[in-house]
Amino acid sequence: HPSIAVWCGDNESNPQPPLEGWMAENIRTFDGGDRYFQANSHAQGLTGSGPWGAFEPRFYFTKYPDGLEGDPARGWGFRTEIGTAVVPTFESFKKFMPKENWWPRDEMWNKHYFGQNAFNAAPDRYDASITKGFGKPEGIEDYCRKAQLVNIESNKAMYEGWLDRMWEDASGIMTWMGQSAYPSLVWQTYDYYYDLTGAYWGIKKACEPVHIQWSYADNSVKVINTTLQDLQGLKATARVYNLDGKEMGRYTQNVTLNAAANKDSYCFHLNFTTDNLAFGKKAFASSVSKDAGEPGAAIDASDGSRWASEPRDDEWIYVDLGEPAEIATIALNWEAAHAKSYKLLISDDAAHWKEIYSNEDCKGGLEEIKIKPVRTRYVKMQGVKCATMWGYSLYEFELYGKKKKPTDLSPVHFIKLELNDANGNLLSDNFYWRSNKPGDYKALNTLSKAKLNVTSQLVNRTDHGDKKVIKATIKNVGPSVAFAVHVQAVRSSDGERILPALMNDNYFTLLKGESKDIEIEFDSELLPDDNYRLSVIPYNK
């Protein structure tokens, strides 16, 4: 349910005079002056409208997910309108789209707002994110299937990005929009036929009152407690699994913590480069751009955050290892604002520097620089000339010894978070797919076929209306991970989906031997003969 309702004088504008003055006076007179009059829905202290297209997840965690005409000084702030393109499931798509227009995308898609008619939903970027992330679709069914993963990831990140900054400079977020009143391919959580899209499930997970989450920007894990109750003795756990379902124990983290009411509480960082000597140390810089993070953002083992300098040639950043260590490889992961030329220097006291490397024609991107092993405490990147007008910007500044260990993680791997109370009861869980190459999840297509066992029963529920509930247990009985399992209740009589229906979960992932209890509740009149079937389809079907 919404936690707040906002009534404004005008949408994305101010009421024409004299209406604005009359509204303000009426509120003062008839509401006793106890309400604040917000004349404009996206200005006057708010952070704007939009964007309305799906971005890669780290965008929502990084300074700043800009809105139109808002107050940028307020950062994340209170965003009254933001959303993404949301393609529905194939079952809904085929109900409104003529078959001759199914594939490939054509002008008929534009009539359903996937084109110039809703250009600000960024349909081309949405298409590109599907292809980059999950591979070129083989047809419309494959397109809609992969689209749900984009819907989940972008919409969950949108809310979690705000929660990550809760009460720092983030105070609220409202989705444009809950549901489209027309069969549409954008801006909806449940579609025209009341089917629950991936966007719904991403947002539902993020909006748990007590919630554990991972940041795409800096790999931090936090507990978000939006209740008014202090929680004591919680246990937060993070586990990482390869595509084959094997737990990678070296990345496991756990901590016992208290979560104060109405606050985010830090748990730990996940370090995916465990032999990076710079991780967790200190970094210092000549300047910091207002649009990026502090120097430490370049040594947080995440390419979702970055340090950036002011736009001057003679800028620098250095890492303090705390004590001398042997360095043999230096990795610089440049953002688009990279150096044209720079030097690498070392020091034992941060005052007297010795040059060990220079690059007069830097192309940006990821540079892995092998040097003759040297023992030092401080390592500096000294800019000589900027390649752009934006100064220098680094996602990561990594330092390694003689033998940089090859990653033991599969190209795509899974992060599983759990939060338990002091008695061991599960309060929150969360699940992410992560890639060694940001945004590239095509390795998911190599998953072996999953094998599931499904049992279910139908029960009547009359405690709050005449309802029926399908209670199902879905178990992974095969050796493979069952990824993004989609469950749909269907009437046996006509093959139509039972909609509208409320469910506790969907698009969930089961490791070997795991099971999930699913409840699907709907009005009894939608299934008068009690005959149904369950469609249970994993991504790796």
Locations of regions flagged by a protein language model:
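Substrate-binding clefts and catalytic carboxylate motifs of secreted carbohydrate-active enzymes
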Residues: D66-Q232
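Disordered, acidic Ser/Thr/Pro-rich linker "stalks" and the adjacent N-terminal cap
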Residues: T274-P324, N333-Y342, D348, S358-G365, ...
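Active-site region of glycoside hydrolase catalytic domains
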Residues: H1-N110
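Low-complexity, acidic Ser/Thr/Pro/Gly-rich terminal tails and inter-domain linkers that flank the onset
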Residues: L196-I224, L228, G245, R434-D466
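Short acidic, flexible loop segments centered on an aromatic residue
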Residues: L228-E247, V477-E496, I537-Y539
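Intrinsically disordered, low-complexity Pro/Gly/Ser/Thr-rich segments with frequent PxxP/GP/PP motifs
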Residues: A236-A238, N242-T274, K404-L409, R497-E525
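Terminal connector regions
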Residues: N271-D275, P406-N445, L499, E521-K541
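Short beta-strand-plus-loop segments that form exposed binding edges in beta-rich domains
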Residues: Q382-W390
